[in-house]
Amino acid sequence: MLFLQFLFLDVVLGGSITKNVVQENISFYLMQISSYANQSWVQNCGSGWLGELQTHGWDSESGTIIFLHTWSRGNFSNEELEDIPLLFHVYFSGLSLEVQDRVSQLQIKYPFDIQARAGCELHSGEPPKGFLYGALNGLNFLSYQNKSWVPSPEGGNRAQKVCDLLNTYEGIKETAYHLIRDTCPRFLLGLLDAGKMDLQRQVRPEVWLSSSPNLKPGRLLLACHVSGFYPKPIWVMWMRGAQEQLETKQGDILPHADGTWYLRVTLDVAAKEAAGLSCRVRHSSLRDQDIILYWGHGLSVILITFAVIVPLVLLIILVLLCKKCCTYQGIP
């Protein structure tokens, strides 16, 4: 979900954004997981995603869409939005019946999962691209290409049989084509427009350093913590002067409850070589003002503060005790 503001303007203005802007793409897609425990039990889970941001959920009990943001409806009319849950209900019902009827024929053993990912991508200066992929128990099974169902190599003969069957249903092929090539791009543009205030927000990261003993004697594991930033794309690196430390290891970017992100970047280094290292953070919210924290500087400040405050506190306590003793001595 990179540089959404540029993408939005690029789409609306027909690709007129300066060529110096890094070209990215944005996608909207639906995720489906259907779990079949036995011949009579199936659970369908669905969700909608704008890039890496979840925008929709699916209530399988009521057969309704869950809108996770105030702008999750995009600019579709109420009539259009009412048609979509009905379409999903028909799809899930039909899929369950077909699958249960053909489990033996396809030699599929319970329990098993069917996954699907369908949506569209917008690339700067290019027409929208639709996609639809299906998987069985986590392995690629089939895809939709050029108005036809195509088996994946991992799916083997079983996938070929399913595609041969699906390709006989012209109505299903036309519906799939219409959804990923027409409906999805229109809905994606509507989401970008309706949610542009949220999607374009910039939140500066907070950065701090820490260390922990390494398993190897004489070494330290330095950690650079970056928290509370939005949007997600960020660059963090341990540096020595202008030299990037290639041994830097980046963890997963983890979400906060408020929609911002957290990242921890570490460097395994000899304790005697830690001096002179720094952590550098680049983020769109910082513009060109990178955050740079030097290892040891914060520790030095703490030690200096501790060295000044502790004697001062002790001196104050000593003075108070002396005054108290003098007071007691003056009492007859």
Curated annotation (Swiss-Prot):
The chain crosses the membrane at residues 301-321. The keyword Signal applies. It is found in: Cell membrane; Endosome membrane. It is a single-pass type I membrane protein. Residues 18-300 are extracellular. The keyword Transferase does not apply. SUPFAM superfamilies: Immunoglobulin (SSF48726), MHC antigen-recognition domain (SSF54452). The lineage of its organism: Eukaryota, Metazoa, Chordata, Craniata, Vertebrata. This is T-cell surface glycoprotein CD1c3. GO terms for molecular function: endogenous lipid antigen binding; exogenous lipid antigen binding; lipopeptide binding. InterPro entries: Ig-like_dom, Ig-like_dom_sf, Ig-like_fold, Ig_C1-set, MHC_class-I_related, MHC_I-like_Ag-recog, MHC_I-like_Ag-recog_sf, MHC_I/II-like_Ag-recog. The gene is CD1C3. Heterodimer with B2M (beta-2-microglobulin). Keywords: Adaptive immunity, Cell membrane, Disulfide bond, Endosome, Glycoprotein, Immunity, Immunoglobulin domain, Membrane, Signal, Transmembrane, Transmembrane helix. Disulfide bonds join C120-C184, C224-C279. Its main location: membrane. Residues 1-17 form the signal peptide. PROSITE patterns: IG_LIKE. Antigen-presenting protein that binds self and non-self lipid and glycolipid antigens and presents them to T-cell receptors on natural killer T-cells. Residues 205-292 form the Ig-like domain. Residues 322-332 are cytoplasmic.
